Amino acid sequence: LIDSSTIDVDSARKASDLARAAGLGVVDAPISGGTAGAAAGTLTFMVGGAEADFASAEPILAGMGSNIIHAGDSGAGQAAKICNNMVLGVSMIAVSEAFMLAKRLGLDAQKLFEVSSKASGQCWALTSYCPVPGPVPTSPANRDYQPGFAVDMMLKDLKLAQQASASAGATTPMGALAESLYALYSN
């Protein structure tokens, strides 16, 4: 059984326990890469489950993706997905704020992109989803802001990350702030 939904870690672990009790092999294998990655066959799968179950699932996942990462036991795929998307959510906000500040300071967006994409500000949110038209031809900003990953989907993942943070006793103030901001963007 391969579960590629993005759900909370505890539910993924419970589903795994139920599947194993029924004699099934199971992995949680949430996906990153969006519709473009699906079309290109370059999806990333973050896989949680027993080593033997991962070995059984890997050839199937390899038909859809180019990055298949065994993150650990049951629930680890979900944990990797929500942690990764928390990084993305926070970095998208930081990149957007930096471009807004640059504009107010009179700095050309292309020049900020050239600097940040070659310096310590380099990140996927900048080089793939730059929020201003021009620097990245394939970004939503150059496609009339047609999303590849909707605000509400990011909000869902940030909520899952905050739920996991509370459950694990982890403090993630930037993740919490990002969740609050995406809730505002969603309305």
What are these regions (language model features)?
Residues 56, 76-187:
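Helical "substrate-binding/catalytic lid" subdomain
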Residues 3-85:
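Rossmann-fold dinucleotide-binding core
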